[in-house]
């Protein structure tokens, strides 16, 4: 069995003392699979999409029984200026308000994720594809800015991102969602 991972720092194991602690290594070892980890810290969905044309990544996908996709957080974290403005708008309009710039990020992400899945399926139609949701790194933080709880407000954005992941995946065959976001 072969598992190939593509995506961002979560899949790449950023910040871990050893790759042996990476959840993908633990998972692969547990099921007796070889892991090809082609994830790159900092990648957003557009960069992951481009990485599919990399010779090694393409070969790893073609030879995999399962492909794990971990991407989404950087689509937002790379656009801190827009997200800071969104937080300001939450102060003015309420926490449920999504500015057009943020909605555009979701739309772009959904298109990229759909294309990533379609390209993987073109390369390896028999592989299982597992797309993981995104966790909210601010959820447990108690930082309040005026009347807005940053963790709670960020959770609305992460929840919407995870809804995007689930909506894209449910339209695809042999694509499964691994939900890592706590309720």
Where are these regions (language model features)?
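Solvent-exposed loop/turn segments at secondary-structure junctions
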Residues: 9-12, 40-46, 73-78, 135-139, ...
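Oxyanion-hole/transition-state-stabilizing segment in secreted/luminal serine hydrolases
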Residues: 47-106, 136-137
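Structural recognition of the beta-strand scaffold that forms the well-ordered cores
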Residues: 2-7, 35-39, 65-70, 128-133, ...
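Serine-esterase "nucleophile elbow" of acetyl-processing enzymes
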Residues: 1-41, 57-59
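Extracytoplasmic/secreted envelope proteins and their assembly/folding machinery
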Residues: 24, 28, 49, 106, ...
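Hydrophobic, aromatic-enriched interface-forming segments
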Residues: 107, 112-150
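Substrate-gating cap/lid alpha-helix
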Residues: 139-180
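Short, solvent-exposed loop/turn and secondary-structure capping segments
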Residues: 14-18, 79-82, 142-143
